[in-house]
């Protein structure tokens, strides 16, 4: 597999069933996630940007193997994420190898949440990919809930509408955000995420930023974002 594939590709699958969706719904959503992490210049955690999540898998850092467990955000290791990944690997070409998977979780958004624009990998990490899987078995375009992808000026360049079993594979350095549903749909929008990069790179990022408190690169208020890199990515599409 080459990380030059799937810069921003959409695939429609027959993955979702009512039975699978019920398994997703019944997962314990005990933790919250935010796209706007605290920084030295803005140390306060923005509670209004948080939303519910279920962590399925987290990589184990060499420096502190119990790091995620001690923080209370360890993966549940529910077999569900591996079963779905096995299906995706048969349907979608050129996915990264499994041993590059470092995180998997289900995010829950609903009307009134306010997720932020973010990137999944810092601009200098070329070998990365994110997979999003839309899990709701029924979705009406009137309900909103799109994933928005932005260019180097943070102008919207592409919107991907939820659809049962729809999968998006993309370079995580592209700024993006999930939109909540409109007032027409006052229930949960479920999305499963898989995140990849080489194990060596993920370990180094952990050591630099979690253990040694190295400040992250930031531009336009987005951690890891670099306009020139994003401009180049869009030019390659």
Regions found by a protein language model. Name each.
Residues 18, 32, 62, 77-85, ...:
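Extended, compositionally biased low-complexity polar/Lys-Gly-rich tracts
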Residues 47-48, 64, 135, 139, ...:
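Acidic, low-complexity intrinsically disordered regions
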Residues 89-210:
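Catalytic core of non-heme Fe(II) oxygenases with the double-stranded beta-helix
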């Amino acid at each position: 597999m080459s990380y030059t594939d799937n810069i921003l590709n959409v695939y429609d699958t027959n993955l979702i069933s009512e039975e699978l969706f019920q398994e997703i719904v019944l997962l314990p959503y005990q933790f919250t996630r935010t796209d706007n992490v605290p920084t030295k210049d803005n140390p306060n955690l923005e509670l209004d940007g948080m939303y519910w999540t279920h962590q399925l898998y987290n990589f184990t850092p060499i420096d502190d193997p119990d790091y995620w467990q001690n923080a209370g955000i360890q993966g549940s290791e529910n077999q569900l994420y591996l079963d779905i990944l096995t299906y995706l690997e048969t349907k979608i070409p050129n996915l990264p190898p499994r041993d590059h998977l470092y995180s998997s979780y289900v995010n829950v958004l609903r009307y009134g949440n306010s997720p932020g624009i973010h990137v999944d990998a810092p601009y200098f990490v070329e070998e990365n990919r994110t997979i999003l899987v839309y899990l709701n078995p029924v979705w009406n375009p009137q309900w909103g809930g799109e994933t928005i992808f932005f260019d180097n000026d943070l102008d919207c360049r592409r919107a991907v509408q939820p659809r049962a079993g729809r999968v998006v594979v993309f370079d995580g350095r592209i700024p993006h955000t999930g939109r909540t549903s409109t007032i027409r749909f006052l229930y949960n929008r479920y999305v499963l995420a898989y995140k990849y990069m080489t194990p060596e790179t993920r370990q180094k990022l952990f050591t630099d930023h979690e253990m040694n408190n190295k400040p992250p690169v930031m531009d336009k208020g987005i951690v890891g974002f670099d306009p020139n890199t994003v401009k180049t990515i869009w030019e390659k599409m």
